[in-house]
Swiss-Prot record:
One of its GO terms (molecular function) is structural constituent of ribosome. Part of the 50S ribosomal subunit. Contacts protein L32. This is Large ribosomal subunit protein bL17. InterPro entries: Ribosomal_bL17, Ribosomal_bL17_CS, Ribosomal_bL17_sf. Pfam families: Ribosomal_L17 (PF01196). One of its GO terms (cellular component) is cytosolic large ribosomal subunit. PANTHER family: LARGE RIBOSOMAL SUBUNIT PROTEIN BL17M (PTHR14413:SF16), RIBOSOMAL PROTEIN L17 (PTHR14413). The gene is rplQ. Gene3D superfamilies: Ribosomal protein L17. GO terms for biological process: translation. It comes from the Bacteria.
């Protein structure tokens, strides 16, 4: 029996869950709105609210914690990013660095007077293939 166990489980390994949530959180910070399934959005909301609260502290320790939780890679490029940089497109260079900047500069100042509840979940129609409940998770304006 799983009494009082609040672990996020969607049929994946723990490392896959951790990476998936970090990638979804980076996408949410970058785009401020993503479409996903309801269980993933509910778990993502917990992590997003914690990251905004961390960003509002605006200390070096908070930045280092955010880099670790978002699994930001500063010094490595994927092969696709390397090709884009080689071709002269510097906008593709380290998207993760811009995510940390946006989190601490834009979102933290936007929510500086708010004490929680930084995201909203809007339910959509179910997905056609597997009838999964879809939703949109977004930051409040």
């Amino acid at each position: 029996m799983q009494h009082a166990r609040k672990k996020f489980r969607v049929g994946r390994t723990s490392s896959h869950n951790r990476c998936m949530l970090a990638n979804m959180l980076k996408s949410l910070i970058h785009n401020e709105r993503i479409e996903t399934t309801l269980p993933k959005a509910k778990e993502l909301r917990r992590h997003a609210d914690k990251m905004i609260t961390l960003a509002k502290k605006n200390t070096l320790a908070a930045r280092r914690l955010a880099v670790g939780r978002l699994m930001v890679r500063y010094n490595t490029l994927t092969s696709k990013e390397a090709r884009q940089v080689k071709a002269g497109d510097l906008s593709a260079y380290n998207v993760d660095r811009r995510v940390i900047g946006k989190l601490f500069d834009v979102l933290a100042t936007r929510f500086s007077s708010r004490n929680g509840g930084y995201t909203r979940i809007l339910k959509l129609q179910n997905r056609v293939g597997d009838n999964a409940q879809k939703c949109i998770i977004e930051f409040l304006a």
